Amino acid sequence: QFLLDKIEKIENKKHKAILALAYSTGMRVSEVCNLKQSDIDSKRMIITIRQSKGKKDRIVALSPKVLEILRTYHKAYWPKEYVFNGQFDLRYSERSCNQIVKQYLGKEYHFHLLRHSNATALLEAGTDLRIIQKHLGHASSKTTEIYTHVSTATLQNMNLPI
């Protein structure tokens, strides 16, 4: 809830779109920066992440809320090739994305936290670990297990056998 509250309050449309997209999809900072307009399919509500880590493509779901945020951003900035443009219509830099996280979430946070938080939120919502593994593009479920941090509230609400 902390991240959702923080993202909701951001007024800068580009910054809000970057953080909302990253948290919602679990995309890596490089994937967000390399994302092209043609990678977003708003009819099928999916995003194709091309040639990511391990040189593999993968597909992630696009939430209606994030699509709305992206459209609001797009109307304000009119990016061309890349979803998030930096100077001279080049892709937005990973350094800039990391600075956005620190600006809005705090200096102790980093962009990769959004990916971990996405995995944890999916697990706590009951998503199977194998689905999360595929969603994040992990070759091993061991890597996915590192990403998922079960909250104390989830442990307290567990249905114990006795």
Predicted segments, located by residue:
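Conserved catalytic core of the tyrosine transesterase superfamily
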Residues: 1-162
